[in-house]
């Protein structure tokens, strides 16, 4: 009985192509011909091969702050899906159009728990759903008042890292 494809390895290759090597062609090779990517809180992403390539080119790959790191929390792998939970940390020293479209750099630090759900067709990524608490990001950037609303700041990321054992960061 064969073990089947290592979807976690495909996930890692995809993320390394996005963040480390910033290689759009390598990123697209990990995906089906007509994938979609959706950053739920910011309403950014694209559907279809050329549109996803355009999104990666204009808003994602090469548009991540230089000091960004991913601190792993957990990963669940099934036969057709990988769910990755991590804390994304960065300094908002450049525009981040996939997360904060139209928001000029504030110079502030951000730490936000993030969940990525990648669905697969065989060994290729068919879709990505990415979730984070946008209110938490806006509070950390000084764009939303915390006091009167039930929102957190970087404390939520700190507590999650404490509870999960605070794994070493991965380059983003």
Tell me what each language-model feature is.
Residues 1-172:
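C-terminal and inter-domain tail/linker signature
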């Amino acid at each position: 009985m064969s073990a089947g494809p290592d979807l976690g390895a495909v996930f890692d290759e995809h993320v390394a192509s996005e963040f480390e090597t910033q290689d759009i062609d390598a990123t697209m090779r990990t995906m089906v011909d007509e994938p979609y990517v959706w950053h739920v809180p910011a309403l950014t992403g694209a559907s279809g091969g050329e549109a996803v390539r355009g999104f990666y080119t204009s808003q994602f790959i090469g548009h991540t702050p230089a000091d960004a790191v991913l601190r792993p929390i957990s990963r669940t792998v099934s036969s057709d899906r990988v769910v990755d939970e991590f804390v994304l940390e960065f300094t908002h020293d450049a525009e981040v159009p996939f997360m904060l479209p139209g928001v000029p750099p504030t110079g502030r630090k951000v730490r936000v728990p993030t969940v990525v759900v990648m669905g697969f067709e065989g060994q290729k990524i068919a879709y990505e759903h990415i979730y984070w608490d946008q209110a938490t990001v806006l509070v950390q950037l000084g764009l939303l008042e915390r006091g009167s609303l039930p929102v957190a700041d970087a404390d939520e990321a700190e507590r999650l890292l404490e509870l999960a054992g605070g794994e070493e960061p991965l380059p983003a």
